[in-house]
Amino acid sequence: MPVHPYLTDEELALLNELYQQEQPESLLSLTIAIDANIRPLLEQASHLELKLALGEVKLHFPVTLKHQEASEEQAELSPPSIITDGFHPRAWRLPSPQELQLYQPNGRPLAAEIRDLSINGMRLLSRRRLFTKQQSKRVLLSLGQEQQIPLRLQLVRQHRGHHFWLTAVRFELPVAERMTLSDFVFRGFLQEISRRQPED
């Protein structure tokens, strides 16, 4: 992950409050006053988002509008897409995600360690080559708590080191599964930022 300035305690608290699914009763209300003439545009918009910039990392929170009274709208944030805005922008990768396991279609664990994970790919470390003749592989990604996401891994590249194979793969997900994985990665992002905070 590219180096970016540490967040202040207030900024970190804001991030944690913006999206708090485990405690739905703890919500941050953000009031925005806009010109009433914009309402027709909001009703026609196919996409609305809140963007947070933290150094070279950009968080894009999808916004869902819920119509209330004629002069009032209620908006809800969904898990964000996290992008590292470097020379080649790409999805932010959660390093060494914990409690994750890949399973083969027969139910056996895939003999590979997930080195990092994004919402559209991952890097795997294994003692043996994962891809031989076929360039794709079907697996189940277990997120714990009985959450499993079916994936069709597409080989990007694989490299043989002295003792291990390092394999990069990509995948695409339907909306519901993508939201689930985005939520997991975002929580990992918040934990990673918390660990990087300087101690008092």
Language-model features, listed with the residues they occupy:
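Structured alpha-helical
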Residues: 1-200
